[in-house]
Amino acid sequence: MTQNEKMKTLIEYLESYKLYRAMKELRDKDDAEPLSEAEGARKKMREIRSFVTSMPDSREKLFLYYHYIGGRSMERCAEMLGVAERSIYRIRLRALKLALCCFPGERAAV
């Protein structure tokens, strides 16, 4: 797997948190979803949250948490981190590179 493919897989993994959160909210809203799927979504959310929080403390870790776990926009992340909006894109790239170093291969199958 190339570095670009690994990066894409990592981004899909982190962004899947939003999908699982939506599934959980749907389940909480009405019982349209089977309980086992909701439990699976909660488990996946805990796994992703644990992955992000296990990273070394840094501005990049905060960005990953705010953006992917918290669902905040890039602009809001910049504001929360006290940086210019144009800087948040560099922080995002550094954060993803840092996360890629911690991203185990077995998680590649999102």
Residue positions per predicted region:
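Short, conserved sequence motifs enriched in acidic/basic residues, glycine, and aromatics
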Residues: 54-55, 82
